[in-house]
């Protein structure tokens, strides 16, 4: 309650606002947190971190980890929330081009989109050729965009070896899906080199 009073008394104090956000994270109240962040963004009082956190919440709703009410989700993809997450991550990068988290999460998000379009296309009847071709195009575009963001993330020195190996694993799968076999060999070599450093 003192945090809420503080944010009312000192609406321009980002330390108080950050403390309030941390409280909601620790108490698993993501939707309440999202409402708080929406208010700060609407009031013009938000930096890159606010957009990133809102993007993360929308991302979690989009992949079905939680529902729009903050309850445990059933794993159903909601592309509307994924698009909201994408816009927030892009705004994060606009305000802070050095945000590794936003860059990496955009790679994951585009992978999710690509997988969604793949699965949607695979369920179509054979007669739906035009729709199938359109979905396959979206699938490829998103996988290529995911690779682009992961390649950008690879340029950050703050990635640990473990995180980098995990990311190279994602990239290997994407290179396989986009039929870039030479790149798979390159990822295998990078993974082997990093494992030897452990």
Q: What do these predicted regions represent?
A:
Residues 24, 58, 65, 110, ...:
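Residue at a conserved register position within TPR or TPR-like alpha-solenoid repeats
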Residues 60-84, 112-149:
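Short coil/linker segments at helix-helix boundaries
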Residues 20, 54, 61, 106, ...:
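Structural register within alpha-helical repeat arrays
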Residues 9, 43, 95, 156-160, ...:
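Structural marker of alpha-solenoid helical repeat scaffolds
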């Amino acid at each position: 309650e003192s945090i809420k009073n503080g944010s009312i008394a000192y609406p321009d104090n980002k330390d108080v606002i950050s403390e309030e956000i941390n409280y909601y994270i620790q108490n698993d109240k993501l939707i309440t947190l999202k409402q708080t962040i929406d208010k700060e963004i609407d009031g013009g009082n938000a930096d890159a971190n606010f957009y990133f956190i809102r993007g993360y919440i929308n991302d979690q709703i989009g992949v079905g980890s939680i529902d729009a009410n903050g309850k445990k989700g059933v794993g159903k993809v909601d592309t509307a929330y994924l698009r909201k997450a994408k816009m927030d991550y892009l705004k994060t990068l606009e305000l802070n081009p050095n945000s590794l988290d936003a860059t990496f999460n955009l790679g994951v998000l585009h992978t999710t989109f690509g997988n969604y379009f793949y699965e949607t296309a695979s369920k179509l009847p054979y007669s739906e050729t035009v729709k199938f071709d359109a979905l396959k195009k979206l699938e490829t575009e998103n996988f290529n965009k995911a690779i682009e963001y992961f390649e950008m993330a690879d340029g950050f020195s703050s990635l640990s070896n473990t995180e980098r190996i995990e990311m190279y694993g994602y990239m290997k799968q994407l290179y396989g899906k986009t039929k870039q076999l030479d790149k798979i060999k390159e990822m295998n070599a990078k993974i082997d080199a990093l494992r030897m450093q452990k």
